[in-house]
Amino acid sequence: MSDRYVVLDTETSALFDFSKPADAEGQPRLAHLALIYLDSEFNVERDYDVLIKPDGWTIDAGAAAVNGLTVERLTADGIPVAEALLEYTKAIETGRVVVAFNAQFDTKVARGELRRAGMDDMFMKTRNICVMRAMTDVCQIPYTNGRAGFKFPKLAEAMAHIGEMPVTEGAHTAMVDALGALAIARWLRTNQMLPEPGVHLAKKRPDLVPTQPRRSGKAKPAAATDELPA
């Protein structure tokens, strides 16, 4: 049976600290969730786009400057995080593969909220494809500090590379970024460069899926920054 997919993007209340577990004190909260459901041929089935009502947390000024979200707007238009988590978990439980631009970030945001809610974080169930990592060797953008290798491209850089015009109006909303990730995923699939899904590895999880093979037959680590708490 062919895989079905769900494109995931999140906006958060502040910047994430990847050196800490997803649900550690001080980690940012989910503020905006976007999901785009795809069939096995990457055709859109439906989408899901919701703001999250704060339950005591606030928006960091830096995050607000990027995503335009405010506590007032989220309080007025948001839904309880529990409702959003039910939608997300249903997608994973039904076997969909998560596709995201920086899947390590978005799945960790979701994992933190699931843990706070006392739910299964679905670490082992969340098969995912990170199109940001897949585009790193495609874009080949050098580091500016002289470091060897290529840096992870920004979403706009990856879109420009494949000939897609980055959206300026509404940029950095979860749905706009999810649509960008979808465009990149389709390009990778068309060019037979879409990685096979894998489970992200994190520190203290050495027994999990060791590699995320590419369609070309080459294997790469499931994440370049695996030595981090889950």
Predicted regions located by residue number:
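Metal-dependent phosphoesterase core characteristic of DEDDh/y 3'-5' exonuclease domains
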Residues: 2-4, 26-69, 90-230
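Extended, low-complexity cationic-aromatic segments
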Residues: 7
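Short acidic, Gly/Ser-rich segments with clustered Asp/Glu that frequently serve as metal-coordination loops
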Residues: 10-23
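Flexible, glycine- and charge-enriched loops at secondary-structure boundaries
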Residues: 24-26, 74
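Metal-dependent phosphoesterase signature
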Residues: 64-88
